[in-house]
């Protein structure tokens, strides 16, 4: 895969994970302070307007729950956000987005279920599937992207950061580990690269269990 190397001076770079649009369970809605699925979608869509037409978004999985009509509508609205480019990492709730990926695979002649190709851009959009993990570079710094928090990563002792989502335990911050959680629970909005740099390694910043949220 072609190396993704970005300069923060050229555009804003945003991160988000675990939008869980369409998820109607109280253990997700409650901690996020939403009354219902529609309120969750309305607020999420409003917050995503922070991302401008010249900006880059990295979406770290679990965008929508299920593959029903409403979930697919939510998914396509996110896919077609008017930003310069959006890169997607697989999560663990993939039904809806998997359907869109399979459409892309069939269009390039990949019909076998066990064959994957990355990067792959969804039709007439700036939305690109990157796979299950990616290493990118921002201002020369390596950044490891994964839906799941991992214990060790490439260049871990040389300033490389790890940005993830999907936390089912409260992982306390550690200044020795440049790891930070982009899940929706943290800010209830996308988080921009400069803010990530300010907060990573702060022991007061932790990865919240997204079934419990942040007080």
Question: Which residue stretches match the model-derived regions?
Answer:
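Conserved beta-sheet core of the metallophosphoesterase superfamily
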Residues: 105-215
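Acidic, histidine-bearing metal-coordination/catalytic regions of metal-dependent phosphoesterases
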Residues: 1-35, 186-215
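Core catalytic region of metal-dependent phosphoesterases/phosphodiesterases
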Residues: 7-10, 14-16, 21-130
């Amino acid at each position: 895969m072609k190396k993704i190397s970005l300069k923060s001076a050229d555009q804003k770079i945003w991160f988000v994970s675990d939008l869980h649009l369409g998820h109607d369970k109280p253990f997700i809605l409650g901690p996020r302070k939403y009354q219902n699925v529609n309120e969750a979608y309305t607020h999420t869509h409003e917050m995503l307007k922070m991302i401008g037409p010249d900006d880059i978004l990295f979406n770290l999985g679990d965008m929508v729950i299920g593959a029903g009509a409403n979930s697919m509508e939510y998914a396509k609205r996110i896919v077609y956000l008017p930003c310069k480019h959006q890169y997607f990492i697989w999560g663990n709730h993939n039904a809806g987005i998997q359907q869109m990926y399979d459409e892309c695979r069939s269009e390039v002649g990949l019909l076998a279920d066990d064959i994957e190709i990355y990067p792959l851009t969804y039709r007439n959009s700036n939305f690109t599937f990157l796979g299950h993990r990616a290493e990118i570079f921002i201002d020369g710094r390596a950044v490891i992207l994964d839906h799941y928090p991992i214990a060790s990563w490439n260049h871990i002792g040389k300033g490389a950061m790890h940005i993830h989502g999907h936390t089912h335990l409260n992982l306390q911050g550690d200044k020795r580990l440049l790891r930070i959680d982009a899940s929706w629970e943290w800010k209830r909005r996308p988080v921009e690269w400069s803010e990530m740099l300010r907060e990573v390694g702060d022991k007061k910043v932790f990865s919240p269990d997204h079934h419990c949220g942040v007080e």
